[in-house]
Structure formats: structure tokens, C-alpha cells
A protein has these predicted regions:
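Motif-centric detector for short Cys/His coordination patterns
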Residues: 1-152
């Protein structure tokens, strides 16, 4: 197993060097605790036989994860990793696909075909259009309270 050290971060990636000096990276989106951590918290880690551990954050990054084919998330994965407010089960239902399948795409256990990925991205864009047109227009005024619907 390849060993890594000399770990560093920026706003999108975790970087590490292997024993040959080659630099590797992976998305910090896979590790929410590290993404939201302070620089001090990120530097407070230990190195074990199989990876890095942040005790205060209860987070582990394995050495092998730097070599995963999906170390950098796809567009579908990135969207759902950065928009946790989206209910995956309801989004899948709305699209007419199985929620477990969509979760597997998001978590990297399965890879969608190009057509399926396009279908998911189109559904994301449709949701965005619906959000952006919801109730806020130039002539928008809130509905009056029911007690003011008619004057005596």
C-alpha cells in the first residue's frame, strides 16, 4: 500500500504526497468535517498505518482514497454533496427513478450512463428554474391575511 504524508488543503481539495514525492489530491467535499474545519483543526491529525485521523473532528482519510477513481466528484455528486438540503428520495421520486440508485450514483457506488447523468442534470436545472421563478416577481405582493379579505 502506498503511504502518504505532507498533507495540505485549499477550499476544494485535500493534497498529500506519496513516498516518491508525487502529489495527489481528492475533493474535500467527501469530508464535510474537514471542509468546515479551521486551519488549526485540519493540522491536528495523526498518521496511522492506513491513513490520517482527526480525533477532534472524528474524521478519517485513508491513503487509498487518494487513488480512488472518483477522488474528484462528478457534477451530479458535486451538486448533491454541496446541496444537502435537497431530499434525495423526493428528488428521485420526482424524476421517476429509484432513490437507492440515485444515492448510489451520489456516493460513487454506481456510475450513471451519460444519458442518465444528463437526465439527472436536466432535473437539477428544472428544479433551479422552478426555485428561481417561485413567487418573487416585480409585481409581487404577499396575499392579504384572511381577516382582511373584505372590508365591513
Amino acid at each position: 500500500m502506498r503511504r502518504f504524508g505532507n498533507i495540505s488543503f485549499d477550499s476544494k481539495y485535500i493534497y498529500a504526497e506519496d513516498e516518491t514525492g508525487r502529489r495527489w489530491c481528492q475533493s474535500i467535499l467527501w469530508y464535510p468535517a474537514l471542509k468546515n474545519a479551521t486551519d488549526g483543526q485540519r493540522q491536528n491529525y495523526t498518521v496511522g498505518p492506513t491513513g490520517f485521523h482527526w480525533r477532534d473532528l472524528d474524521e478519517d482519510v485513508s491513503f487509498e482514497s487518494f487513488e480512488y477513481p472518483d477522488a474528484i466528484p462528478s457534477k451530479v455528486q458535486e451538486f448533491f454533496l454541496t446541496h444537502k438540503e435537497i431530499n434525495v428520495a423526493e428528488f428521485a421520486r420526482r424524476m421517476g427513478i429509484n432513490a437507492t440508485l440515485l444515492r448510489n450514483y451520489i456516493n460513487g457506488f454506481k456510475k450513471p450512463s451519460a444519458a442518465r447523468e444528463r437526465q439527472i442534470l436536466d432535473a437539477i436545472h428544472q428544479l433551479g428554474r422552478e426555485y428561481s421563478s417561485f413567487g418573487i416577481t416585480d409585481g409581487y405582493s404577499p396575499k392579504p391575511s384572511p381577516k382582511y379579505l373584505s372590508e365591513p
